């Protein structure tokens, strides 16, 4: 089924997600020793990254002309993965200037699906796949299910030497996520 929607544009009436406390355990957590497939063909183990890393986590990117999952726009925090990714693309140089050594996106979609989005959106960084949910389960990340898919709720992390030092959750609106991270790093 195809529909006419532009994944880069957010509807005006999106419901805002509420802070349900589902990420409180993450600040100070050491990342698990799990390698994730990346869209650049590499395998990335976030627990072994040195320096400062930023990871933004999102449910799933849509594709122009493809139907959204059932009730997608009514799920608080679901819509906006493409604008969030574009925001991090547009703030990539700012993040580097502020000392971020690595930037990644992360979702449960396949690497092939993510690669198409990374190329279409001209992302200057890799997207990581947790398709098997091993990373998600190891960290007890908040998820939701729709149309048979288990998806991670939207958030962003600042990581220093494999330890999560700051969590942005909930993230809303998603197109301001990168700006929020830049502002926090600038403070």
Question: What residues fall within each predicted segment?
Answer:
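Chalcogenol-based redox active-site neighborhoods
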Residues: 1-187
